[in-house]
Structures are given as structure tokens and as C-alpha cells.
Amino acid sequence: MVKSSFDILGIGCVSVDDLLFVPGSYPAADTKTRVLSWDRQCGGLTGTALVAAARLGARCAFAGLLGVDDFSRIVEENFLLEGVDISHAPRAKDAPAPHAVIIVAAETRTRNIFYRIDGRIGADDRLPDESVIRAARILFLDQYGMNGCLRAAKIARAAGIPVVADFEDSDHPQFPELLRLVDHVVLPLDFAQKITGETAPETVAKAVWHQDCQAVVVTCGTAGSWFLGKDGVVRHQPAFKVLAVDSTGCGDVFHGAYAAGLVQGAPLDQCVRLATAAAGLKATQPGGQRGIPTRTQVEEFLASNPETYGSPKT
């Protein structure tokens, strides 16, 4: 029996990220490079999105797989620190938290990610209980643990609960089925181009749309985002100019902030604007989660009438 309800229930991937910051550009092969600094933060598509939503005031819970290893304990401690409920997250010995090493180049502000997965990750096939999913106002998921993601999305669809998703891989044969169960499809341009075969953001957004969609958002970094809702009109949200130092986690923060705006009743354009601001502010600090802004920080930033990049020709 569920004792409490949540604004956003996340079922997907979490990780522990070790970030190494190096001077110049990414090191060449067979060279020795000095590390400027080292940092450990939690990450993962769903994990980072939930932290972002929680900092923006949403009541969040994580119900994806956690292991009994040291990295899983780090993830648990981080969620508790951020106010994310983990009481419904299944624990399993064969589900250690993924670990990533991220090399961030100071000069080019680019990153290379090296990750290790040693067992099951993401959604469990049978947990959480259906009542837990029905207690949420929004279900957030990624593609990790496909059978569990499909189960959760079908339960949410039957209950009329909107599904927001963060995808980075379409290779699983059941991915198209999962995509059709997502109400708010928020994708980076390169991934959306891959699954549609289209090029221009406006065309890509229309190609991603399906009859059960509430919204499609295609994110394009400093070029901003293109989005459309039920009216079928594609609109553009410019990116805000910030002093970016690291883009790690920006896409996941965008997803979490979008979900937070959605659960708080904001219209589509304001959800995208909120998400754009949150992702931009995150980019001003290194790592995937430490730089995630609070609601107050985002509101103050938007109130300052921040400069945006010009709308590019497409």
C-alpha cells in the first residue's frame, strides 16, 4: 500500500561519475597529461533529471534498480540529500550502479565519457508495484531496463499519467513501442535525426510526433530548442548565453526541469523556457549535478532578461 504520492516518479538509469579536468584539448594517444582537478558526482539520465526536478520544487521518487555495492550506496545518499524518495527502489545484488569516468577538456569544453555496466540497470521487470506508479503525477523514464520501462509506461498510459522520457539509444527492438507510449518526447537533435532520417530541427520534430503525443521537443545546444504541441505549430526557444565550462548532464537537467514545469502546471512554451534556463545554468559549473540550479536561481536568472543566441537559419 502506497503511503504517499509523488509529483514525479523516475524509473531508469543512475550512475556515479568521476570527472577529470585536463588542460587544453582531449589528450592524444600514448601521452601523459596532468589533471587540473578531480571530482565525484552522481549522474545517470533519470538520476540527474530527478535531482533537477527536486531542486525546482517537485516531489520526486526513484524506483529504478539499486545494488548493494558502494556506488549504489553513494547514489542512495545523494538522492536522500536531494530529497528524492527511494523507498520503492528495488535492491538486487546483480544491479550495481554504473560507474563512469568523464574526461573534460578545459580549452575545448568538450568531454569524453568512459562507462562500465556490470549488471542490470534501470527499470526492474516487475517492480515497483503498480500502485506506486499510479500514485505519481508524472512518470519519468529512459530506455534502460526495457521490459520494466514498457511495463511502467503501459500502466501510466492506462491510468492517464503523462510519461516524460530521456532516451540515448534506439537499438533495442522494442524501442519503437516504448516511444509510442511517451506523451512528452524530449530528444537531442542528433538522436532525433538518427531515428527519423530527417535533418532540420523543425522537420525532425514533426517526424517524431505521433498521435498520442502531447509535445515534442528537439534540443540543439546553443542553437536552442524546437518544440510543438497539439496545435502542430513548431516554435523555437533560443538558448541563453552563459559562461559554459562543462556540458555534462545538461540534457538530463533539461528533461528534469521540463518535467518539473509540467507538473507545476506551466504551458508548453514555459516548460521549455524553464528547462532551457536550468540547463544553461548547469553548464556554468562542472559535473552533471552540482551545478543544477534551484527554483529561486532560475527565476532570478530569467528575471534578469538574459541574452540569447540568435535564431539560426535552418
Residue ranges and their predicted role:
Residues 1-65, 70-74, 81, 243-244:
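Glycine-rich phosphate/adenosyl-contacting loop at the front of the ribokinase-like
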Residues 1-9, 34, 201-314:
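Conserved phosphate-binding/catalytic region of the ribokinase-like
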Residues 80-94:
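A glycine-rich helix N-cap at a beta->alpha junction
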Residues 91-92, 102-143:
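Conserved phosphate-binding/catalytic loop of the ribokinase/pfkB sugar-kinase fold
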Residues 120-129, 147, 166-173:
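Active-site glycine-rich loop that binds ribose-phosphate moieties when present
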Residues 150-236:
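Conserved phosphate/ATP/ADP-binding segment of small-molecule kinases
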